[in-house]
Amino acid sequence: MQPASPVSGDAGPVAEAVPPRGAPQVLVRRRSVPFSPDSPLAPGSRGGGERRSTFREDVSHAAAETYLVTRLAFILLRYLGVGYRWISQLAALIIYAILLMPGFIRVGYYYFFSRQVLRSVIYGDQPRNRLDLYIPRDPKKPSPVVAFVTGGAWIIGYKAWGALLGRRLAERGIIVACIDYRNFPQGTISDMVSDASDGISFVCETVGAYGGDPNQIYLMGQSAGAHIAACALLEQAAKESRGEQISWSVTQIKAYFGLSGGYNIENLVDHFHERGLYRSIFLSIMEGKKSLPHFSPETVAKKLCPETIALLPQIVLLHGTDDYSIPFSASETFAGVLKQAGAKAKLLLYEGKTHTDVFLQDPLRGGRDKLVEDVISVIHADDADAREKDALAPIPGRLVSEWQIKLAHRISPF
């Protein structure tokens, strides 16, 4: 398969953007509707005040998605064949999930029943073009917004994986939009990046309708989602610097947070193969070996002109030093390349933390979460009132027993 452009230029238009960082741009805009806290948009609805979906439509969508996931699972099994690595990884994943199930159940209850969660808001016309919104309770002013692209090895990503992060940030006055996207084999990397870009465009254009501040939009991705979001960001910056028509502007993004991401996938093919993501599957996801440089943000960043680099927002890369799914050197090297190119890049390493410690085990443990605090410190850097509230914020309670978390840490397939 030939390399495809990672983002689509014909996604929905955007709302009024922040002042540009120095490049011409052609933004396509559409009407948005002011936010009304008394009448939140229903799950399954479109943004901008469009028609809400009916119960029958929701049931029909759920049935169609279930059928689709089942069919794609069998297709994926044909790709995987019988291999001890992925079978052992699957077994470890099942045990890992059972150990953390008490926490997952409590987060799931919040996800399905909290009035602060708007599930399956439609952002595009492709399958799985939906996102979940986590809305702060009783906001007194427009809230900062984080557009979050979930991980999942490009195969098992799902918007609900961001529920715990969404809850924690919403409790601190930040709106979170968890963007779903087509996974493999339903789509390949260009589809994933295109979906993510369309989701970001939707957030930028409708943020005001949900009580968000259009001048405080942040982009974040975790694991494969960090890679996808970085691809979308760099491609959008390149298109913007060339003066092409765009559906959202990188100048609307105040900062990008990349958590446990891989940014030079050319260097990770063999590593992933040893971890159970077989080379043949990974190259199919990435649309062939020739496409690897095109979808490696680190490689792309080396070739960007100074005008494009100047458009990029602050980039914050976060990684655990004991991450064996994606070594922390991936973030370390990418940060160095960005700095050398003139970008504003910052690297935060979490000593002794694995791929899932930072994102799952630590938040389930309760107490002050280092990752959440680091992200909030960037978002609230210019808001003295918010920082005062952060200092007095309630400490989250424990969701899973310590022995279960420690055992899950040892068994985790990630």
Curated annotation (Swiss-Prot):
It comes from the Eukaryota. GO terms for molecular function: prenylcysteine methylesterase activity. One of its GO terms (cellular component) is endoplasmic reticulum membrane. Its main location: endoplasmic reticulum. It comes from Oryza sativa subsp. japonica (Rice). It is an enzyme of class 3 (hydrolase). Catalyzes the demethylation of isoprenylcysteine methylesters. The active site is at S223, D323, H355. The gene is IMCE. Residues 1-54 are annotated as: Disordered. It is a multi-pass membrane protein. It holds the Pfam family BD-FAE. The lineage of its organism: Eukaryota, Viridiplantae, Streptophyta, Embryophyta, Tracheophyta. It catalyses: [protein]-C-terminal S-[(2E,6E)-farnesyl]-L-cysteine methyl ester + H2O = [protein]-C-terminal S-[(2E,6E)-farnesyl]-L-cysteine + methanol + H(+). The chain crosses the membrane at residues 90-110, 145-165. Its EC number is 3.1.1.n2. Belongs to the AB hydrolase superfamily. Isoprenylcysteine methylesterase family. It is found in: Endoplasmic reticulum membrane; Golgi apparatus membrane. This is Probable isoprenylcysteine alpha-carbonyl methylesterase ICME. Substrate binds at G151, G152, A153, Q222, S223, A224. Keywords: Endoplasmic reticulum, Golgi apparatus, Hydrolase, Membrane, Transmembrane, Transmembrane helix. InterPro entries: AB_hydrolase_fold (IPR029058), BD-FAE-like_dom (IPR049492), GDXG_lipolytic_enzyme (IPR050300).
